[in-house]
Structure formats: structure tokens, C-alpha cells
Amino acid sequence: MLNTLESLFNLARERKKSPVDGSYTNKLLSDKSLSKDKVVEEINELIEAVENNSNKIHEAADVFYHLIMYLEANNIRVEDVMNELDKRKKWVTM
């Protein structure tokens, strides 16, 4: 399960280093405005899907993918995000 997320992180980093012409992933990585807009769009679509009880899994997957690309486009390392979550986990268990 987590291997899939790790593969997406690796894909984002590889495409950022070695772009592929015409790649949607590269479009997201090189156009921060597009990447941001897609995250907002996909989150709204997920909310609508949950409320309508349809396509929830598909839309959730879209959110994960676009968020990962947005983070990478903006040089936000997933390792730093995970470290922050680890810190918060300690607060919750207190």
C-alpha cells in the first residue's frame, strides 16, 4: 500500500530531474499555478463524491496524486511532512 505512494514520490522526483515531453506529470511539476488549481479542483471533486457517495476512491486517488505533484513542484519534501506528522502524533498521544 505505502509502496504505491512511495512510487509516486519517486516518479515526481525523477520527472523533475529528467522531464518527459508531453507528460502530464511534468506539466504539473513545471507549472505551479496549474498544480495548485488541480489540487483545489480535485479536493472539491472528492468532497462532492463523498457527499454523493459516488466515485470516492477515484477522486481520493486524484487528490493524492495531485497533492504529491504540488508538493514536489514547490520543493516540499515528503520526508519533512512525515517528520511534522510524527511530531503531531506525540501531541495527540499526550
For the regions a language model picked out, list residue spans one by one.
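Flexible "arm" and connector segments at domain edges
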Residues: M1-A60, F64-M94
